[in-house]
Amino acid sequence: MIRIGHGFDVHAFGQDRPLMICGVEVPYHTGFIAHSDGDVALHALTDALLGAVALGDIGKLFPDTDMQYKNADSRKLLIEAYRQVRAQGYKVANVDVTIIAQAPKMRPYIDQMRQTIADDLQCDVMQVNVKATTTEKLGFTGRGEGIACEAVALLIKQ
């Protein structure tokens, strides 16, 4: 049996912290306003994985009202969510992440992002795709106010 999940997340810029995307620190003058580290891509991917096996979403599993997740490393959240996916009898066939950002440019970091996700999901890097696009200066991402991300996860029964 196969299962598919979709995730979406968005965070605004504005906090003095490192900008984390796909578990990689991307040099930029500001970070995200968020309860955790704000890694918009890993949050979308976590939602996709959880959604594929009907385990809700990142907010259900790691509520922002719980102080233990304050400034949490989103890689740890992803790894825990994937542990729960595996407990349901599924593993990743492939994942696809789309980062929607006017700035900063993601291209120099894509390979590292793919490898980081592959490491966290215990899969081959060829099962992980990460890409970035702009909104041609339209909307909040186009104005440089934040970043959005979509993710899709295809899971197969172990």
UniProtKB/Swiss-Prot annotation:
Catalysed reaction, written as an equation: 4-CDP-2-C-methyl-D-erythritol 2-phosphate = 2-C-methyl-D-erythritol 2,4-cyclic diphosphate + CMP
Gene Ontology biological process: isopentenyl diphosphate biosynthetic process, methylerythritol 4-phosphate pathway; terpenoid biosynthetic process
Site (Transition state stabilizer): H35, T134
Subunit structure: Homotrimer.
Main function: Involved in the biosynthesis of isopentenyl diphosphate (IPP) and dimethylallyl diphosphate (DMAPP), two major building blocks of isoprenoid compounds. Catalyzes the conversion of 4-diphosphocytidyl-2-C-methyl-D-erythritol 2-phosphate (CDP-ME2P) to 2-C-methyl-D-erythritol 2,4-cyclodiphosphate (ME-CPP) with a corresponding release of cytidine 5-monophosphate (CMP).
Cited HAMAP family: IspF
Name of the featured protein: 2-C-methyl-D-erythritol 2,4-cyclodiphosphate synthase
Name of the gene: ispF
